[in-house]
């Protein structure tokens, strides 16, 4: 029985391969599309792509152009060829402005870019591009079918960008004692982070380290400059205490404030 099953599988594979080769060499566009549909159902995306890319140009200007173009873009996405799928979904969006699947294509442009986005520690240009495309989708389709997923992915990618930016500022802070102008660089980085990433969960981290950076900068200054620079640290503390009364850094921030006050006294 087992041998019969194996033989049947071999026969089906040979027949399938024969059908694919026949369609590949045929000039019949409809045969190519039917065979591609069978291959897509079997998750044989690479072979389906080979057939669809032959017929997409042939169907341009016909009623079947949009469905075939969408199949092609989807096949590229499923095959993990995200730069190409993103391009094809973008082409679809621009070419078929009244098509009911235009919303889906607009969403999938962002999804293709999302799949190319690296971990947060790497260059985040693909993440920024994906974020922009999802924002386009959200703006165009505020009640869209894919809105919930788009918002979820936006939150995920924004967190990556926030974490990347915060760690850059944190690295300036860690290197500050060992580099000329290190504390001013850390201060500028934390200030920029607070302004540029207003919804980030790292806001209180940045606000606390801003106090710490300014305090360290002040006490390492010439004596004539210390009071003025400590006043700035106090201002940072006041902002922190107002914005984050329950922060995990509250005790540490209070300790810094005591040091500032005792220094002034």
Question: What is the role of each PLM region?
Answer:
Residues 1-17:
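Sec-dependent bacterial lipoprotein signal peptides
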Residues 16-265:
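Acidic, polar-rich low-complexity tracts and alpha-helical solenoid repeat scaffolds
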């Amino acid at each position: 029985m087992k041998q019969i099953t194996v033989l049947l599988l071999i026969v089906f594979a040979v027949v399938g391969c024969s059908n694919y080769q026949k369609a590949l060499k045929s000039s019949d566009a409809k045969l190519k599309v039917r065979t591609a549909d069978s291959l897509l159902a079997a998750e044989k995306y690479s072979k389906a792509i080979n057939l669809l890319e032959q017929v997409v140009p042939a169907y341009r200007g016909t009623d079947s152009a949009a469905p075939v173009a969408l199949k092609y873009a989807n096949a590229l996405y499923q095959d993990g060829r995200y730069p190409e799928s993103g391009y094809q979904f973008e082409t679809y969006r621009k070419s078929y402005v009244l098509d009911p699947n235009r919303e889906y294509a607009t969403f999938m442009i962002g999804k293709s870019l999302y799949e190319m986005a690296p971990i947060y520690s790497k260059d985040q240009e693909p993440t920024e591009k994906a974020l922009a495309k999802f924002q386009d989708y959200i703006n165009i389709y505020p009640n869209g079918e894919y809105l919930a997923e788009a918002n979820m992915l936006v939150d995920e990618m924004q967190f990556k960008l926030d974490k990347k930016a915060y760690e850059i500022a944190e690295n300036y802070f860690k290197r500050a004692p060992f580099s000329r102008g290190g504390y001013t660089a850390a201060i500028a980085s934390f200030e920029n982070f607070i302004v540029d990433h207003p919804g980030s969960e790292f806001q209180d981290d940045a606000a606390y380290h801003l106090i710490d950076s300014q305090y360290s900068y002040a006490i390492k200054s010439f004596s004539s400059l210390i009071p003025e620079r400590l006043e700035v640290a106090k201002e940072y503390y006041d902002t922190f205490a107002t914005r984050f009364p329950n922060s995990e850094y509250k005790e540490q921030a209070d300790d810094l404030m005591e040091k500032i006050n005792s220094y002034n006294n």
